[in-house]
Design a protein with these regions (language model features):
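Membrane-interface extramembranous regions at the lipid-water interface
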Residues: 1-43, 60-101, 113-164, 195-226
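Membrane-helix interface and helix-disruption motif detector
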Residues: 40-59, 100-119, 169-188
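Small-residue-rich transmembrane alpha-helices that serve as helix-helix interface/gating elements
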Residues: 183-199
């Protein structure tokens, strides 16, 4: 009986530590995303044009380094995040090398592989979120999977649809075709904005979910998480 009690106490302690790690780093990642959105917004309003270009580059790489660290910390608990960390690190190192060499040729050659690597890293992150939530919040887990499907469909739609539209518009030179293409692009842009908002909402909810689980397990009788 004592052995059984000790086993469940140890299991709860492990689950509490795991939840605490997820709660902490998902919340850090959420606020990191908010910071980058604010920076991008200010940049679009030309409010940061007075800042040195090198500082903006440094902030961008600082974000990338932070992202690698976050993925690594999450990866210590779940392998999919470890994969995301490795891919993000590859993208970061490649970006630094290209920046140091000031090579437009390398930048052009890296553009497509870089996007593919980022897409795969994002896949492992989002599916990783779905998997770790499967036994704690099934609805949120399903939402992460749906969000990935929406995102990849929209990205493929943008990559394939826009070139096809340009070719068709060039062939037929029709105002109707042009208008339909513009509507298509606006629709995709709006949908991607919605996906980005949902990404932030799900990220915050995931962080809060694990923070609550960690607190519950730490305060439960027999837990030695503290």
């Amino acid at each position: 009986m004592e052995t059984s009690t000790s086993f469940w106490s140890t299991l709860d302690s492990w689950r509490a530590r795991r939840a605490a790690v997820f709660g902490k780093w998902f919340m850090i990642y959420f606020w990191t995303q908010i910071f980058m959105i604010i920076l991008a917004f200010l940049s679009s309003l030309r409010l940061v044009n007075g800042m040195p270009a090198d500082l903006l580059v440094l902030l961008s790489y600082g974000y990338s380094v932070t992202e690698v660290v976050i993925f690594y910390q999450l990866g210590r608990q779940e392998d999919r995040f470890k994969t995301s960390a490795g891919l993000a690190l590859i993208a970061l190192v490649a970006g630094i090398i290209i920046q140091l060499l000031h090579s437009e040729v390398l930048a052009g050659l890296w553009r497509i592989p870089g996007r593919i690597i980022n897409l795969i890293a994002l896949y492992h992150f989002m599916i990783g979120c779905a998997e770790i939530l499967l036994t704690t919040d099934g609805k949120l887990s399903d939402k992460w999977r749906s969000l990935w499907k929406w995102y990849i469909d929209l990205r493929v739609g943008a990559i394939v649809g826009i070139p096809v539209f340009l070719i068709v518009a060039n062939i037929f030179k029709s105002i109707l075709v042009v208008n339909l293409g513009v509507i298509l692009m606006i629709g995709i842009a709006i949908a991607l904005i919605v996906v980005a908002i949902l990404w932030l909402v799900y990220l915050y909810r995931t962080a809060r979910c694990f923070q609550q689980i960690g607190k519950t397990l730490e305060s439960s009788p027999g837990s030695d998480a503290n």
